[in-house]
Amino acid sequence: MTILEELGLLKMDFLGLRTLTVIQSAVQEIERIHGIRLNMEELPENDSMVYDMICQGKTEGVFQLESGGMKQFMRELQPRCLEDMIAGIALYRPGPMDFIPKYIKGKNAGGKVQYTHPKLEPILENTYGCIVYQEQVMQIVRDLAGYSLGRSDLVRRAMSKKKAAVMAKERQNFVYGNEAEGVPGCIANGIDEATANKIYDEMIDFAKYAFNKSHAAAYAVVSYQTAYLKYYYPVEFMAALMTSVIDFPNKVAEYILVCRQMGIKILPPDVNCGMYGFSVDNGAIRYGLSAIKSVGRPVIESLVREREENGQYRSLKDFMERNSPQMNKRAVENFIKAGALDCLDGNRRQKMLVYQKISDSISQDKKNSLAGQMSLFDLVSEEDKKEFEIRMPDVEEFGKEELLGYEKEVLGIYLSGHPLENYRGMMEKTISAKTSDFQQDEETNLPKVMDGQKVIIGGMITDKTIKYTKNNKVMAFLSLIHISEPT
């Protein structure tokens, strides 16, 4: 891993971030709808409204800032500039997190920060007396112990690779100097032994999870850009964000809840309006067609292309004819269950009862055409052909539970409602814990509900497994969803 560096060559790591695609898609959608081409490199750097949103912890979907712990940290940190964001991202990791209380205290102290030695003030002033970046360590060893630029970089490398033996050896040089290697050391520069060792101890603690500022800065810029898009163009941003996770129903469901909290309406998938991914439709977000299970990208792209070239679909038969043969029966059935064909005549139950007959009729017509055969249907006028059309049966729509069940089956979430909606008021008054409260916290690795704690839960059982212990006692494992959880 170090051969390139030892040869003096530049080594670079390129990270493929999904967020960059989200930004690009949002910018394209903004241009399509508003006629504005945003230059993300020229955004106002210190927009107070954007920082207000971040300080309130409303950062779901914002790069690096959407976890529960990070949202709480932003509420405590109250960042008002990019420098604060950079420090926040660098601090919020194992190791540096221990410095968060000290950093926040220093930030709120109004300049009353105490430094281990006066020479540290110009180096640590921007981070309120805390060592946050590798670059600060490099400057400390140069300014306090007289290291050269090259040697300070060796210390940085030792930290980044967590080379404890090298760091321990370097303590001697830092405190006492090394005349043979041209290092004066702290004592020669007027810093007493105890203070020098204390400073080095702090650097050792930091070195366990050393982070370079350039990395944190690059991430902070992307964080700010996504926060800016979320604040000023929430519909376009959330549509792009949900498209980026379209293959993960649980994540889509999470963002749908966020949209509803933001007052953004979610429209069902629609073959006459929808696109491959989530799209903006008159200030609302239209569900992406590719979120429907068992329907591949080529089918969706062909469907949209056919609609754009030859107009909207007029009926179920028209839809199936124009998309045959790439649209198989399973795909049509899932479109019906998802509500993507509600724009065409007939309810979902009617369509479920006739789509196979229509498919068989289309297949037979194609066989006759290939064989050069004519049917009775070909001999009548266009007006009389309507008498031969497969008609919708006279049946009522599925019940609410069935409709929701089909949506869950093909979309992975409940979209048009929730099976527990009628019990919302009672559940909100009665229950004391949600299903998410049993999940581990990302910081403490502990759930909100502890072992032995008595709580009242409420929800719908979606799965049950019965098992027997070695003593032949019955055990049951239940899967439960809460009313606030679409999945």
What are these regions (language model features)?
Residues 1-484:
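Noncatalytic, beta-rich nucleic-acid-contacting surfaces in large DNA/RNA-processing enzymes
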